[in-house]
Amino acid sequence: NKIYDVKDLSNSTIKDITFFHSKKYEFLASKTKASFCITTENLKHFLPKKCNKIIVDNVLYATAKITNLFYPESINDDFDISAQNILKTSFNKKVKFGSNVLIGKNVKIGKKCSIGHNSIVEKNVIIGDNCSIGSNVIIRNTIINNNVHILDGCVIGKKGFGFFPDKIKNYRYPQIGVVIIND
């Protein structure tokens, strides 16, 4: 079986891997459609027989590691600003860019927009018409609709969900959702 995505118990399909870390979710675990589930020895019996169980000591840690394989942290470390990097990226009329702006693949920027100095717009971001993005802004996994103004220094869609403990230290839980900002 191939795994195509990481999803929660209730939204997973046969192509997904999910996780089950607390008995309070047993009603969802018994109905999951995921082909694979990360869980503990104590919880595995709540899962459907057709679901392949991956038994671990720390479910959240294992899920974070797998999620990072599907959703790498950031493009910032290996950002290539060559012309080939912005294939399939579209800029409409009258878009203004400050200096040192980085634009990822498959970005769509509407009409009459401005993006301030030192800002990063990562791949697959959509920015509507008449938007202004301040300086030193990072945007990831975001849809910005028309007439939105983002102030200097904002970070949108980068980190979320906080931390969870392991035996040695705390780990950041990966963010895989999309932020939608309306006017």
Each predicted region: which residue ranges?
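Terminal amphipathic alpha-helical/low-complexity segments used for targeting or macromolecular assembly
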Residues: 1-84, 112, 147, 153-154, ...
